[in-house]
Amino acid sequence: MAAGKYGKYIIEDPKLVTDLANHNFSSASGFTYPDEVYIDKELCPEAGSWLDIVWIWDKTIPPELPGLHSHPFAEIVLLIGSNPRDLRDLGGEVEWGMGEGEDAERFILTGTTAIYAPPGLPHGPLIFNRVDRPILNIAIGLNTGDYV
């Protein structure tokens, strides 16, 4: 831990997201985790959220990452295109689902998009149908509590 009054907020050896349960994507392809790290209550008792940053370079294999799931906290998902001349151009086609069973809805996204998934609402899978340019996928878990 870093020294000083605020050293407890500087986590120099954070967890890797791929080391967490249900996050081993070693057999998957089409994306990379650029320095993806995870801070939780074990490392910083005051940390109440997490942040995932993933560059999508190609269609993911398997295509449904992650599958349909829910959690007891809200999540924000950002899909950001990498066209410097048109930031609203996603550079591909992404399929996103919310709800399950008869309430399930699917959305086809081709522009930079922000998504809010309320606590408990089933969502996913996130399917990258086409990737023409890298797509930045950011997920933020809000007020996650003890969830891992």
Which positions does each model-derived feature cover?
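A short beta-strand-loop-beta hairpin characteristic of the jelly-roll/cupin
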Residues: 79-110
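Conserved metal-binding segment of the jelly-roll/cupin
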Residues: 106-128
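A short hydrophobic beta-strand segment most commonly corresponding to one strand
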Residues: 116, 130-148
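Short acidic (Asp/Glu) patches
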Residues: 59-63, 98-102, 119-122
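Short basic alpha-helical hairpin corresponding to helix-turn-helix/winged-helix-like nucleic-acid-binding
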Residues: 58-65, 69-81, 92-94
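Residues at beta-strand starts and edge strands
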Residues: 49, 74, 90-92, 133-136
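A short, N-terminal "cap"/entry segment at the start of jelly-roll beta-barrel domains
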Residues: 1-67
